[in-house]
């Protein structure tokens, strides 16, 4: 790691920290405010990959993972008040799901980007982010809320997330967590397209000696 990599590490740390805070605040029926900041992690990873290469990009990913673990450890100690009961802000399943989803999705993003880096400028960031975002969403929501994985944390009642309701209020019935997952996924896909604009602008301004082939 060099001093030139520090902005990427700090940006990733800030995004992970902000997302862990904002996920506590709802936005509408299906989302939290964290859904709008978390996808920026893919932008940071892709910028580091394009400018410095896959090695520094992975270092940024590991830095973000460490910050995420730290946030989860703090969250498990913060108790919130429910209707006559208390519960941790971050359950074990959420902690495992978020950490595993982040690390797996980001490393896959780095690998796909590096494989496609010689093609059209937008193909590598778009394809890697779409695959990474899909994997991230599937892993997190399944691990955190699926009734089939209650053995991970038997004391954690996820019955609320498995309530059968019309999918996104308009489709056939499905567990609530699936609607939450798809809503989150659609935000990620939308931001993946929007992020191409700052990606192009930042890469074009990078010093020639910084750019990786």
Predicted regions and their residues:
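Membrane-embedded alpha-helical hairpins and interfacial helices in multi-pass inner-membrane proteins
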Residues: 92-211
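Helix-adjacent hinge/juxtasegments
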Residues: 73-97
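Hydrophobic transmembrane alpha-helices
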Residues: 1-62
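Membrane-interface helix termini and inter-helical loops of multi-pass transporters
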Residues: 24-28, 79-88, 149-155
